[in-house]
Structures are given as structure tokens and as C-alpha cells.
């Protein structure tokens, strides 16, 4: 059904019911379903029982400030209406002159939200000795503890003052208003970069449930009063946090402009796109790696990148890991409960695990309480790049295999590898987190078998598509697996491998490189310790899981989010027409993964080991 808004739409910047709605309330009768809430305890002969809330408040000499503020925001009509409310009214000496003057100098919407609605709720909430602690949701959707002794921690001056349309309790303090984390974005100072970025994606929508429905006109729904609320796609889809939810508790890092600019400068180079990007389409590739040219199997259509993509992804990566929920105990140090130890992990609302949060906390220059959590304003946002905007790129299954009779996937139970540590003797510690992860019960790899046929000249080959590569420097590794992982008594033979990389330069010219760069085709080497000469051919340690180090490589353009990708070709360099070759070298290829490790992450592991 088409919705027509026939009255002037009033946009609500904070998403709460506008006070104008209450002016319609005299037209509405109290709901009989809530009669239990609309009856105050017997008032006896109390004269206030025959007066409205407004009449009782405006005539009370202890509530002159409350009265003046209600008049300033035109709220008297609401307190005079038949709709039933409970009011917790701060007495005059509970409201400091400074706060009173600030409110009186504010606009009506501010007074309404920060004072009137802060101290009121619908229905009847009397004070009695039987009252246990409960939470009151005030008209501005804030939460307040309510007991027989206090409201929001402030004791009572008087309780259960009856009126024809509600009940009033006078309290000795002013319930302090706090923005929620979403509302706080609009009030940020010195943090214009994050403020402007988030506000850019604010959108307003009609809250049908809160609006006053009108008649149908020409088959179209109309509204007597329309309530507009605000939501934000950055917060909902990138941060994945309900920052307006008063029932949740979050800690949010707020980078000031210095921190934002520093993070932008660090992240942006990883997303260096070119308008059109040609690349090798592995589905079209037919020649073996050793005979392939740079422009072979060129994709029919170049991948295209929008001119704003680099800026958009940079900003997205800045904000995506700023919010943490109190639901996870590992996050509690952010809320002042304990402290982070070295390598402790915190968990963001965007479902990312971060370490070294203490370093970010050390750059806190201000903390502020919010109605649903707290903020930490920071002057440096130094993410660990590999945990956020520049992760390790890993792939285990080839996009294409050439000269292959059979390609199979293998999952070996980790329990079967217990006591066989010699298999992994040459594997750096960095790789054990991926090869034998705590979240899996299996060691996995893929294998090809094409060389077991006597007389074949085929050289089996894996072609890996390296998707989502950033424009940065990686250390490239390939992990191979020996037959002994699955067959302990198999013949112990080394591999004999070469590697080729297809990539595109910043001028959109396709390139084809032997790895490692600068390799000498006339030299062969093993992975024995002490050998460091760059060579074209790799011969692994026989009978072991090998991590072949193909060296550093800098990709000049970014492929993230595009159809395009660079490709890694891995092939046997020996044919098997010779029985001596079949006896000397492994006739299968088994690969547990190709890893592109960002240089800064690789350097940390190299230094530690």
C-alpha cells in the first residue's frame, strides 16, 4: 500500500517521539488493557488527587524550575492531558543554577529530551515498601534504576502524589542526561573526520508504529501525525553495532582528526586501484607455465574500479573495528574492568579479533559516559595491519590444474599425526596456526597424480588465483606435503618445482615473473640450512612438510573486490620418461596452501624466530 504523509513531516534527529505527538493525546482515551497501570493508590482526601499533573506541578513552590522549563518547551498541555504518566520531579535545589540556565537557553527540543522526557514515563509506578529494584524506561528511551528508596540514585522528597492523570514523586537530584553512542556522533568536537563520514550515511524513515494513523484516501494510507526516525548504514552494516540501542553496552574508540589522518595515510596505499585492470583468466589458460607468455589467456574484459573506491575502502577500514560489546568478557578491560595482558584478544562488533588493544588505550585522551556505554577519544589509531585492512591471503585449492589425471582433497585427522613431529620439523611457527588450527580437527591438502604413467612427458601443474590481493608487499610461501603424511611407509622423495607469477603493473601492462625474482635458472638448490642463493628451482626436504619461501613481491595495484586477480603457477620441472627421474623425485604434488603474508607481519615472525 502506498503511504502518503499529508501533514508536514517533522524529522527527529535522535529518533524519539516528538513532543508534538503528545498534543494529540487528549483526543485519545487511555487503553483499558492497562487499567492496572492507570490507577494510583488510594489518595484519601489529598487535594492533589482532583488536579492534573500540570496543576499540581505548577502550584508547587518546590518545583518552580520544573514549571519554567515545562513552559519553555510548551509541555504544559501534555501534563494537562488525560494520558497517564509517572513523573519524577527534581525539586528546585536539586537543579543547579548553571544547569538551569543552560537548559533555559536551549531550544525546546533539547529541554524536552534532556529534562522533561528524562524524568517521565507512561503508566503508574508508585513507590511502596514492597517495590524491588526495577528499570524504568523514560519517555526519551533512557534507562533508570527505580527502587523504594530512590530514582536514578536520588532519594525522594515526597512520593505517590496523586493526580487525575498520573502520579508524581519529588526527588532530591537531577537525573543526568547522556547521549547514546549514536546520538553522540552529532555532538563530537575535534573529530570532524569520523563525524562527517558517519553523518554522510544518515537516513530518515517513517516509523509507522509511532505515527498516528489517519484515514484511507483514494486507497492510500494517510497519517495525522508522522514520526520520522534516523538510522545509519555505516553503523549497521560496517560497524555492525546498534549504537542507538539503550539495552546494550558498548565501548567505542573515537579517533580525533590527527588519529584519523594517520590511519588514512597508513591504509590508503593498500587500495591503489587503476581504472581498468587486465589480467590472466586461468579458465582460458592452456599452455604450461614454462611456455606461458605475459599476455596469454588475457581476460575478455578488463576489471574496472570506480575512482572513489580507494577512498571509500580506506574510510571503511578505519571505522570497522572501533566498537566493542560488553557482552564478551575479553573486552572488559576497555570498560575499566582489569587490564590487557600481552597478546590478549578483544572482539569487535564487526566480528574481528584484535590484539594489542592496550596500545590503543594508551592513546586515550578523553573518556565519556554514554547512556549505553562509553567512548574513548584517541589521538592515534595504529591498527595491526594484518588483523584489519591488510590480512594474510591464503588459498588452498587451485583454480586450474594442467597435465593432471586426478585431483583430490585430503583431510587427515590431527590425532593421527600425534607423535610425528618430524614431519613438521622444517615448518616455521607462523604457519602452524594455519596448518593445524585450534578450530579444526584435520590437516588438509590437495594432491594431483599424473606422473605415475610410464613414459609420460606431462609436467603436472597447479594454477592458483590469488584473490583480493592489496597493493602492498607480501612474502609469498607455498606449503607442500610429503606422501608420508598419509602413508608413513611410502618412499621418501623430494619435490622438484618451479614457480611463476602473473601480475599487472600500474600502467595496466601484464607481466610474467619467475619466483623468486632475479632467480638464476642454471642453479638448483635445496632448502637445507645455510643455502641462500636465489634460484629458479626448488627441491624440498624429502619426507617433510616444506614451506617454500618465494621471496618478497610488491604488487603495484589493488585487486580487492574485483574479478581480476594475479596468478601463481606451480609445476614439476622434470618429465618422467626417465625411470631415474621417477625413482629420484616425488611423482605427485601435494599442497597445503599458498600464503601471501604482509611484510610487516612476516618481519615480526622472522624477528621472533
Outline where the language-model segments fall.
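Bacterial Sec-dependent N-terminal signal peptides
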Residues: 1-53
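Mature, structured domains of secreted/extracytosolic soluble proteins
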Residues: 31-609
